[in-house]
Amino acid sequence: MQGPALRSPFRRWLPAIIALVVAVVAAGVLVLTSGESDDALVVYNGRSHYGGEEAFAAFTRETGIKVKLFGGDAQTLHDRLEGEGAKTKADLLVTVDGANLWRAKEEGLLMAIDSPTINEAIPAELRDADGMWTALSTRVRTPMRSTERVAADAVSSYEALGDPQWKRKLCLRSSTSIYNQSLVADLIAKRGATATETLLRTWMTNKPRILGNDIEVLNAINDGRCDVGLANHYYLVRQLSKNSSYRVAPAFPALSTAGVHANLSGAGVVSFTDRKAQAVKLLEFLVQREAQTAIAKQGEFPANPNVDPIKVVAAWGDVKLDPIDTEGAGKNATAAVKLMRKVGWN
């Protein structure tokens, strides 16, 4: 049965109501408490899957301090914070990619804090020397292999992906991926442009299949379209959680090498906040066991070395992390894109 027609006044305001709902959803606003939230700590959260925001909710339960999250991609939140300047409501910035943390520091968006709690919990290589930010988790961009067609020791370095035996059997994500751009920028910072170009050319000589995202790369290896590839490790965690028989495994660089490229998700106190003490308290909470355990559930490596990764990650054994050079990667971001184009990585 057809319901009664909408009354004219409601019909007149309906487009505005819909627009408002869409705007709220698009903004990614989440208040982790009931009641009024004007006094809530405001977090610009560019890492939206931290345990269903479990870590932030746990902070509210423990301290009584309310938290309001504004989600979005890292670039959008950075631009928003930069545009708002001193008028921003943000107290804490959570973002992805070490280069983004460096840029936020360089542009004066973060303030220095001196926290013995953070310094004790997080290794020096995973936090800013000036106290502007700290890592909350790390993710590695590692070679991947077929467990059916590739021996465990056949790929033990990034150089191994350029071995001629992988010609037309290598899968890579597009060069437009920020993950690939950050990897290359970090390689330039640590190895130099010439050595990095040589490495990338060996990959391109193998006529790699270029795909749209990391899941496509992993599926291509699983399905037999490729034998080896490159992907962030937590995407494999997700696939294995759906299918324990998934025929892909990480091929971490050998412990004798520099290690596997480890990028960061991290956070810093916004330089314009008038709630520094509460923001620091939240940041300190995020590096402790309860919050780090919640973050680790998403498959990333917790930044606090006293917190174990989840079982599927721990089962992979010892992994030597090579943390991103945040300043070097930030300064070489443009050079990385140009180099990838130069060698024909589309």
Across the structure, where does each feature detected by a protein language model lie?
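Periplasmic-binding protein-like
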Residues: 139, 168-175, 199-204, 210-211, 245-271, 285-309
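Extracytoplasmic ligand-binding site segments that recognize negatively charged/polar headgroups
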Residues: 46-53, 72-76, 88-226
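An extracytoplasmic/periplasmic, membrane-proximal ligand-sensing/linker region
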Residues: 194-196, 303-346
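Short, low-complexity disordered leader/linker segments with a strong preference
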Residues: 1-40
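Early extracytoplasmic/lumenal segment of secretory-pathway proteins
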Residues: 15, 29-102, 346
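A bilobed periplasmic-binding-protein/Venus flytrap-type ligand-binding module shared by bacterial periplasmic
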Residues: 144-149, 262-275, 294-295
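A ligand-binding cleft/hinge motif common to bilobed small-molecule-binding domains
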Residues: 99-103, 222, 227-248
